[in-house]
């Protein structure tokens, strides 16, 4: 609601539009339609809304349409704890569509990162032509904090392979290869509706290179591989997949978190260092595709590893184990009663592991 209220206040003055739709399904599909027509569009929700948006997010994946979804996690399932803190949407954000997923999931861990990463989400969505989910939580999205400064000069709009009239790619009156299998980096040219000679189709069905529905087995395999392959390359281009407060080449304790746990983990890490322990702390900012190489170095050089998260099923720890084989032993510190972690509480839990 706070995002909506902010957009109502400021978007019209910048030439933008804010719509409050009848439900989350409409919100997501309208954002997809706006993006398909060339606008930068997003929708914001919480866990239940993300569940409703699942099929529409899959449509954006299949049509390779840019889409940004902001999910402020809360207690679930169902209505759950609508005004309390939790981090239980991680797996839902990555795998919430049926079929093989081809999306990007990022999770800022501070006010500054929220500002820069949300802007970057729009660049990623257009460059990789896929949905980008920004995963936040109540503590981070509703917390109030003063920051030193935000550098607007760092915000550079990148629209990716957006074809405009006059380029040689669209001089032919033939159907435009919107889903070109030989495109560099598996990212094909994107043409907006109404562009002369840029005729292509957009459908949720599997399709050939111009968008015509196709059940050809070889085409199905090739298009599926194309969608998955292009997203995997984000690992190599995302500027900082981890927040790293890690001064030690080898550590006695590595603490891993995501989203709003950064502040309390930082306090705990600092106190343990004052006691002579070598403590490294990282927050995972790029959750999908997973930054295996960036994280694995810290995992292999730590005597003990704890993963701090707000859910009952250790979703972040499970995600690490899924992507980093063989994975060292992980100790999960979990809290899922609707409240945040407090310093003394988390400090005591970390000492138990040590």
Where are these predicted regions, by residue range?
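Residues at or immediately preceding the N-termini of alpha-helices
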Residues: 24, 111-114, 118
């Amino acid at each position: 609601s706070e995002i909506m209220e902010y957009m109502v206040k400021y978007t019209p003055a910048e030439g933008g539009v804010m719509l409050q739709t009848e439900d989350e399904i409409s919100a997501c599909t309208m954002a997809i339609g706006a993006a398909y027509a060339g606008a930068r569009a997003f929708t914001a929700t919480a866990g239940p809304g993300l569940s409703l948006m699942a099929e529409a997010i899959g449509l954006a994946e299949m049509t390779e349409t840019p889409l940004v979804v902001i999910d402020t996690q809360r207690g679930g399932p169902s209505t759950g704890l609508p005004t309390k803190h939790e981090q239980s949407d991680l797996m839902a954000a990555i795998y919430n569509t049926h079929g093989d997923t081809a999306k990007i999931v990022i999770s800022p861990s501070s006010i500054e990162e929220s500002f820069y990463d949300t802007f970057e989400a729009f660049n990623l969505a257009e460059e990789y032509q896929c949905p980008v989910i920004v995963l936040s939580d109540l503590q981070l999205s509703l917390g109030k904090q003063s920051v030193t400064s935000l550098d607007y000069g760092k915000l550079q709009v990148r629209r990716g392979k957006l074809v405009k009239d006059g380029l040689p790619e669209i001089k032919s009156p033939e159907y435009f290869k919107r889903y070109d299998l030989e495109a560099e980096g598996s990212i094909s040219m994107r043409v907006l509706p109404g562009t002369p000679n840029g005729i292509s189709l957009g459908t949720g069905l599997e399709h050939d290179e111009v968008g015509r529905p196709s059940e050809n087995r070889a085409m199905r395999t090739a298009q599926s591989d194309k969608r998955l392959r292009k997203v995997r390359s984000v690992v190599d281009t995302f500027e900082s997949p981890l927040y790293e407060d890690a001064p030690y080449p080898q550590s006695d304790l590595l603490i891993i978190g995501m989203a709003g746990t950064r502040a309390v983990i930082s306090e705990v890490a600092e106190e343990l260092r004052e006691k002579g322990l070598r403590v490294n702390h990282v927050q995972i900012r790029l959750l999908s595709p997973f930054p295996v190489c960036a994280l694995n170095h810290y995992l292999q050089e730590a005597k003990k590893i704890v993963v701090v998260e707000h859910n009952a099923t250790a979703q972040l720890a499970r995600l690490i184990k899924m992507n980093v084989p063989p994975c060292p032993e992980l100790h999960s510190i979990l809290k899922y009663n609707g409240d945040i972690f407090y310093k003394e509480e988390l400090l005591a839990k970390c000492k138990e592991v040590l």
